[in-house]
């Protein structure tokens, strides 16, 4: 007997690629089931569709299933019969969603997308300006289609008068016409091949870049037409397809009226005008009338395809523009984003959430009524299987009546059946998690408090949605991958995300505090039980200091075990917590005051040492304890808890006195307005801080008498405890409650100079309240804007990274990035240990003695990074997503550790989306503010020296010095740094040293804490000479390039260089200080920048190290620093900053002053032979940081300004660029205290570098200076290498995330992101193919995404497909060999084991793989 089972397989999803192209009139007719000839829709009396109308049943199919229109044929037995009376085929009514019709247009009509979507394809193809094409189309001008023997030119436009004149002169020797027919003829007549040859010749010959660019654009368009098989005349339509009627429905609403889709109106207009035109042509109407009708037909079709693209939009009866076909697919409400990328799903519900303090971490409370509705199908089947009901109908009735048995069955159904909970907005993957439902009374969903952080939920009325996974596979995935107990770590940072907050923290803090002289102090207990008994009987106080004997086993991270035994000093509260501490963790973790950070450490340590299961149990127990003791503590907020300090009034009086003095000084013109304002702001800030400090003193300490002795102890004030423990509130808020509110900001960020001296306990006066509304209101407005902006940033990030998936184990590269600690302002902000964790080494790590510590390819875990630290390694090379060589994906080695799972990332992980979510999710926490570092914000003191914070050795980097006549070492280099390393050689500090600084110590010297290693003048940058000689001033002319000022008080006179813009004449003078020797030969020339103050006079003698001039630093530093969200967006969009720094494009020597123009200065870079290699023109106002004759390397700064990432990549290389983006982006997040792993930012940067520009096309078909996907270039190079031909040379180009998303290989992904019309227009002309590689494309067509379990399924089905081909099985059969099938082999033991204990088991992953392998999708 044959063991194969054959059955029909209606699988419409069996396609690998999707292609989009232009439709020819024949193709449109082949789709159609008939021509729509009348504009009528339905008969007003019978409500039946009119024949040949827009809803005609003959064309589109029957209205009722298997029933013709007149009712002659009914039921399934007549299927396929065409009724001879009404002409309707007996078929299912759903064919009305699929069958299309068509309209035969009397005259051709141009498709508006190819005309008006910029750049106009028709205009470009015909090499005509869009304006001229439109003139012809809309019947304003004639166009010459065939000049014949006349002097007219082809494509020449003629007005009516000119046309009449030409007819008079040449008769019918030439042809000229107007309208779409003319355009169609021109398109059809174009000989593409000869045009291409002409253009190539033109491209080669032309010198101007503009001409070249135009030629290449047109060439590309013609080549696509040649290659794609599209004919250009198809951009002009002669047949218009009609959408199936059920996609543009007409529905009756109450009151006998009808609601209709706008498309019906638009189609009606087209049909009306088309029919009228037909009549007019039959009647041989005058040309002018016909012409007008043709123009109106063109406009009607334009409106149908894309309303509002040209001229005014056609409006409906409600004065709103009608929604055209283009509007149906684009935008948030369009087909792509509304129905294809996100759909409403069945088996879901939503309700308000409340807190479930008694739940376990993997549970949620589900209201009974809701559960019954959600699990209805399961309940029905159980009722039938259990014999309670014989039919579904009966089961339905039982459920409706809510009989007792129904609830029992519901209990068994939901047992072990996870549900998904989701809270909008879902900003990262933890916004949807799986829980096991517990049935509860009431109507609100109960949520476990510890998952609130991941969902960003609170219980002030938030709602959440519940979804039921139906299939076994989906339940398995929910349990293994999405269960809340499996998502302990945040994928963004790798830190625990289920750490306790708020009341839990308060409770744990309260019971771990100690109190002097509490009842039972000093007693010794032998065990936890003794303490518990004594506490419950009331003989000891919970805060009493006691001694406790302990004996526990402790594991460390390396897996070693040691014993912890002996008597420890502790408190009763801490001893009570000992019961919940699992075996393996040290009591020292608990034996301290537990503030939020410490609790987080306990969870972290538990996860590292004991694994997920024990951590989950511990977290739950900590939560129960926290809730219990915060309730028992009775901590609450009362007005008396805010203690106002006694010295507040005195402090305020003192401040007011100082301000009075300053105002008097200002009135007698001793200080400027700016100084007055800054001083007042400073005084109030200082006072406010002092009042705050004395309030903290008052609130944080209590005086108690113990045995008649007065003692100061830490206070048990409720407000203080809340803030101190990290449960709620902050020092700043407390200051406003009990100190003084202080300074308020205006919406533009500046401070209002009248401070609010009252606090909330005293209450504000009307004026004070009014002052404070300013900032408060801005805060609210900001929040609203910020949320939208952050959401948009996330969307752009997801879009650019969505198709980045780990697709192989190892790409084999030894490329990578150099990692060292991140140092800001001389302090190590992020140690190397943190950055290196979870990365793969790209090169061996070698100690100073030359010993190989770790080999390349090692994945660094916690123990290995400690090893790096112990050996004083301060720089390593790690693999990075940016340098990964895998094409169309990433390899697991370059990505490193999966942060949420603590092991190397799995093949199939969609790391792109995770990266995008990790960066976008904290976006809402980032500020929107643009900081102004002038006036109020810069309350910091100016720094003028560097003191060492760690003892060790100093090392100079890029520092050149000269010795002046006082014997001091003066720095004359620009980008110098001093590095302080400790005894192990690890970098502890790194300081930038400005030019002109005095360095008292030499490189390599030992330093102690507090030693000064550099001093400088903070207010001016000195220009210093490194040669001795006589001064000659050139072009320093008083009143023209400089101004003399004489100070009456000091008797000093100064010479200051003035700006070019202030000069009326002599704009080309360049003030310079030249230093010459005795013979008058020039030794050095120093150009003087605007604002420089001279320190030397003409003919004076200079020594080495003398200051020639000083540039005051006031003007240059007051630039705006963009912070927060806008800065992150700016980095990822790779925007070029205004007045960016100019980098040197090559190595060489700088030559200045040659051939300057009126407005610009010219920088020439010359090689050893004196030839000019590069020239740069700059406005004269830009300040150069290089001198004439200075040697520069490629990428050195020539003129300062903000960094341009594009230049950085071009001149300094990939590594410098990657480093810049990483450090800049991280500094924004660090300011807000958000931790994001570097690899997420690197992942996005990889996607920004997807394209490259061709430097030399080699033997390929590419064109020089064209930018193309890097993957395509690499694939082309592989081919050329095999053939032994010349390869393509290229250089990477940087694209912002929006541009990168729009230029992806997949047109479906790009079209569903932004600019849908443009993307589809371009794709259709190119006959573009979408290979459906990314996630988005697969979601759009309703497939499993090729990542995670979907990738496994895809590989599996590829194997099956291969087998089918080898066996020669036809497509419409599924061939299953049952001989080898044994159902008992499929093991679900791991799911069984969960029944014993509901906490997650590691074996499940194995079972998931087995299950997926054994399931043939």
Swiss-Prot record:
Pfam families: RNA_pol_Rpb1_1, RNA_pol_Rpb1_2, RNA_pol_Rpb1_3, RNA_pol_Rpb1_4, RNA_pol_Rpb1_5. Its cofactor is Mg(2+); Zn(2+). Zn(2+) 2 binds at residues 811, 884, 891, 894. Mg(2+) binds at residues 458, 460, 462. It catalyses: RNA(n) + a ribonucleoside 5'-triphosphate = RNA(n+1) + diphosphate. The keyword Transferase applies. PANTHER family: DNA-DIRECTED RNA POLYMERASE, DNA-DIRECTED RNA POLYMERASE SUBUNIT BETA. Belongs to the RNA polymerase beta' chain family. The RNAP catalytic core consists of 2 alpha, 1 beta, 1 beta' and 1 omega subunit. When a sigma factor is associated with the core the holoenzyme is formed, which can initiate transcription. This is DNA-directed RNA polymerase subunit beta'. It comes from Francisella tularensis subsp. novicida (strain U112). The lineage of its organism: Bacteria, Pseudomonadati, Pseudomonadota, Gammaproteobacteria, Thiotrichales. The gene is rpoC.
